[in-house]
Amino acid sequence: GRPDIFTTEMLPESDYKLKTVTKFDDYDVFNAKVKGDFYYQYLQNALHLNNGDNTFSEIAFLANVAATDWSWGALIFDFDNDGWKDILVCNGIYKDLTNQDFIDFLANDKNRIRVITEGKFNFKEFLDSIASNPIPNYAFINQKNLSFLNQSYQLGLGMPGFSNGAAYGDLDNDGDLDLVVNNVNM
């Protein structure tokens, strides 16, 4: 009965990916943002558990759903038809503009000034230089104890790619839910 809320962010699952796509603020910048009412901003998905009294508890880390990388198209539905809501998160971006190597070496001020002063820009070459790293989707199966288990590979959704949307419904009218996931450049 009570609706829960799941929101996605872009916290990578691996520490390596976190270090290669995230630019961390130094202490002074962090404090300036807090003082400027930007509050404390941290990358992570949020799973808001409805407490039934007009309040919610954030349980994403407890539930094992906090980190799903570049996330789009999250759905909450009974994926495995066991009566418990599961979570699907579609992932991937074809050209990863958050890659810090790209930002530091290709999209830096020196190259921007060169493009402006010389007036030359090879857009195709520039796009080809941006990293393209396919990642798998996440299919979190409800474990019935406020936690979820990623079963994407077991359910045929673990192939790395660039998915950015999904929908579900009983498309063939057989009484169970069907899933459609769209992929880019596959």
Spans of features found by a protein language model:
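Acidic, glycine/proline-rich Ca2+-coordinating loop motifs
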Residues: 1-186
